[in-house]
């Protein structure tokens, strides 16, 4: 498949999935929202627990990646494999968030919300757009590398024989 055909298919899929943007003007409530609508309540404790869980998972995944790379590069050295496993276990134990850490995150978030409560929807939207752009960039880069990388292409070698077999 040629790269231009891939880009065309990607563009068509993007336009098809974004059809709601084209019809957003026809929605009656889309433009005239009531100013006295109640804001969505934010459970600060739940947000802090989610943030703590995210940080814990991030640290664990980083430690797992390092351990896996160490094991791959150890060339079946049993001592290196054991050391990588024990290092990962220690990192996983240290990554667990304590109640004090969650309380610090909760206090920090509460202070930020009290300073500017209207910034959360904009920050959330910015995070989603940034994540979407990053994922799309990685998808395009991966497709480009898969199509044009010389090491990954397994071109069939053609052999010709002369005469009869």
Curated annotation (Swiss-Prot):
One of its GO terms (cellular component) is extracellular region. The RxLR-dEER motif acts to carry the protein into the host cell cytoplasm through binding to cell surface phosphatidylinositol-3-phosphate. Residues 1-24 form the signal peptide. Effector that enhances P.infestans colonization of Nicotiana benthamiana leaves. The keyword RNA-binding does not apply. Belongs to the RxLR effector family. It comes from the Eukaryota. The keyword Transmembrane helix applies. It is a single-pass membrane protein. A motif (RxLR-dEER) lies at residues 31-57. This is RxLR effector protein PITG_09218. Coiled coil: none annotated. The chain crosses the membrane at residues 129-149.
């Amino acid at each position: 498949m040629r790269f231009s055909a891939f880009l065309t298919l990607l563009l068509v899929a993007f336009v098809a999935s974004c059809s709601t943007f084209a019809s957003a003007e026809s929605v009656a409530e889309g433009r005239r929202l009531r100013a006295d609508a109640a804001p969505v309540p934010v459970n600060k404790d739940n947000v802090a627990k989610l943030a703590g869980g995210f940080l814990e998972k991030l640290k664990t995944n980083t430690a797992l990646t390092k351990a896996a790379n160490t094991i791959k590069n150890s060339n079946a050295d049993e001592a290196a494999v054991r050391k990588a496993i024990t290092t990962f276990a220690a990192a996983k134990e240290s990554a667990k968030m304590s109640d004090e850490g969650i309380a610090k995150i909760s206090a920090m978030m509460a202070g930020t919300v009290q300073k500017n409560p209207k910034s959360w929807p904009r920050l959330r939207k910015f995070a989603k757009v940034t994540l979407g752009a990053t994922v799309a960039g990685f998808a395009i880069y991966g497709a480009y590398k898969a199509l044009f990388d010389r090491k990954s292409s397994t071109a069939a070698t053609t052999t010709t024989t002369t005469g009869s077999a």
